[in-house]
From Swiss-Prot:
Keyword Ligase applies: yes
Keywords: Coiled coil, Ligase
Top enzyme class: ligase
Organism domain of life: Bacteria
Pfam families: CC_BshC, Rossmann-like_BshC
General function of this protein: Involved in bacillithiol (BSH) biosynthesis. May catalyze the last step of the pathway, the addition of cysteine to glucosamine malate (GlcN-Mal) to generate BSH.
Cysteine pairings via disulfide bonds: none
One GO MF term: ligase activity
Family: Belongs to the BshC family.
Name of this chain's protein: Putative cysteine ligase BshC
Coiled coil: 455-491
Family annotation (InterPro entries): Bacillithiol_biosynth_BshC, CC_BshC, Rossmann-like_BshC
EC number annotated for this UniProt entry: 6.-.-.-
Length: 540
């Protein structure tokens, strides 16, 4: 296994600027991720905060992580947190089936790597924490994965669908037989496949819900690295954030007004806000009597669900926050604030979308007497298997094409293979046709002035015939180069599936089943966490 780097960053304007030229967007953030002194400043800030709740939190973390099958290093890290001796580097993700897209794995790697790096540089205990977004209710987003095949990505989907907007952490695992059958059919009978299938079966059987299943698989992959998982849906965790929910409710619409101000600031700087501030939104959800997660809104002095079938005064709902905080969960705006309330967060390892929405939260952090942590971009990785590497070498495909797509390269290749110069031949034919037909029309128009107009229509028809002929010739040329085109498209399918970066589409388990779980360790030790460029990892 080896690594190469491509000098490219996220295509989205704001996170791209964050990574290339932080100075342009620094006013949206609290700390500069490039400067060690900023981490020291953040460290001092976090160590000065009250830590009474960490004992209760650590007890919950210990129980939850032991249930996931964690290693001794994770338990040791939780003990350090319990004693108030550790800071955290945090990342998070919705609990997708079989761990979801590849970038979930890269987030975990980045978090472990940054925690290790900062522990050495600051001479303090810094532990990695993974926030399982178990309160998310978007089942359609997490119920499937894509498997790489020679013909492109193949989607496989978990059977079943919840009756309503139920948090993933409350959804029992449905029958996975069909999922496993499809997975077995798509993957070759080599390597670690049988063990991988058994791992998936066992963890699905042991887990109480989709979030736990995710946690068990992630724990298996990262057991040796001390990664601590937190499930915010658990009542004991929610209880710690009761006062935070109370303030959101009783001071409404303050949070939404602060968000709107940040959105306007970002628009004024020429960027589109990642989170569009919705009018009247409270930025909390509550669980109704069916367990469905409903957004809350503040209108005309009252708080209600979206359709207005339930209403409360600020006082009524505020009291419910204190007496039954498990009935509430934060939205994407309040989640980082809840995270800050629970943990001594030194840094957050973020994807491009998260970089953009954190940029809107500085005012909201300040409103709750907090400071936003250091925001650190997660590793951006494309993996290349041996067959694809051979094809890349054969056709001399530049590495930059692996991140931006091969469409232009394929067209250029066809032009290079075109010994006849098809386009030039037909351009000359069109030019000659226009010239000769024009001469004929000019001569004949003395018979009748209408002939000139007829000639223009005639020329259009002739050009269409020539264009059609040209397209058929090009199709023959493509057919003659079909093997090359198919091989180049195979590179495209494996590196830019569906026109997206590989890390956003494919899942880690097809690679784990082919090469074994040891690839996690190899990849982790290969990447340099402080190099933010696109990483191309070649498997042996």
């Amino acid at each position: 296994m080896r690594i190469e780097y491509v000098d490219s960053f996220y295509s989205q304007p704001f996170p791209g600027t964050y990574m290339r030229d932080f100075g342009q967007v620094k006013h949206f953030f609290e700390y500069n991720p490039h400067q060690l002194q900023e981490y020291k400043t953040r460290c001092e800030h976090e160590l000065a905060l009250p830590k009474e709740h960490l004992v209760a939190l650590a007890e919950n973390l210990k129980d939850f992580n032991q249930g996931l099958g964690c290693g001794e290093k994770t338990l040791h890290n939780i003990e350090l947190l319990d004693q108030g001796k550790a800071l955290t580097v945090v990342t998070g993700q919705q609990p997708g089936i079989l761990t979801g897209p590849l970038y979930t794995i890269y987030k975990a790697m980045g978090t472990i790597g940054l925690a290790e790096k900062l522990s050495k540089e600051l001479n303090r205990k810094v532990i990695p924490v993974f926030w399982i977004g178990a309160d998310d209710h978007d089942h359609e987003e997490i119920n499937h994965i894509f498997i790489p095949t020679a013909k492109g990505p193949k989607r496989i989907t978990l059977a079943g669908k919840p009756a309503g907007r139920i948090s993933v952490g409350n959804i029992p695992i449905p029958d996975i037989a069909l999922l496993l059958e499809e997975l077995e059919d798509l993957l070759p009978p080599i390597g670690w496949k049988n063990q991988g299938i058994e791992l998936i079966k066992r963890t699905a059987h042991e887990a109480a819900n989709l979030a736990e299943w995710f946690g068990k698989l992630m724990t298996f992959l990262f057991k040796d690295y001390g990664l601590v998982f937190i499930n915010p849906v658990l009542p004991q965790v929610r209880a710690i954030t009761a006062s935070l929910f109370y303030k959101v409710v009783t001071t409404a619409p303050a949070v939404n007004q602060l968000l709107q101000a940040s959105c306007q600031q970002m628009l004024g700087c020429g960027y589109t806000p990642q989170v569009q501030g919705e009018k009247d939104k409270l930025h909390l959800f509550w669980y109704n009597e069916h367990g469905y997660r409903e957004a809350l809104y503040y209108k005309k002095g009252l708080i209600s669900n979206k359709d207005g079938t339930r209403t409360w005064t600020k006082g009524q709902l505020g009291e419910l926050c204190l007496t039954n905080p498990a009935k509430f969960s934060p939205d994407v705006v309040m989640r980082p604030v809840v995270q800050e309330k629970l943990l001594p967060v030194l840094a957050y390892v973020a994807g491009p979308g998260e970089i953009s929405y954190y940029a809107l939260l500085k005012r909201i952090f300040h409103y709750f007497a907090m400071k936003m942590p250091v925001i650190y971009p997660r590793p951006n990785i494309t993996v290349i298997e041996p067959l694809i590497k051979r094809l890349i070498t054969k056709y001399q495909v530049p590495l930059s094409c692996l991140t931006y797509g091969l469409e232009e390269f394929i067209e250029n290749y066809l032009q290079q293979e075109d010994q006849l110069g098809i386009e030039t031949v037909f351009n000359e034919l069109r030019g000659t046709l226009k010239e000769k037909q024009g001469e004929v029309v000019k001569k004949l128009s003395i018979l009748d002035p209408d002939i000139e107009g007829m000639g223009k229509e005639n020329l259009k028809r002739l050009i269409r015939v020539v264009n059609s002929f040209e397209e058929k010739v090009k199709q023959r040329h493509r057919k003659n180069n079909q093997v090359a085109i198919q091989q180049l498209q195979k590179i495209q399918h494996m590196t830019q599936p569906m026109g997206q970066w590989q890390e956003r589409v494919y899942n880690i388990f097809p690679y784990v089943m082919k090469y074994g779980p040891g690839i996690i360790k190899e990849m982790y030790h290969l990447i340099e966490i402080s190099d933010w460029r696109q990483k191309i990892i070649f498997f042996d």
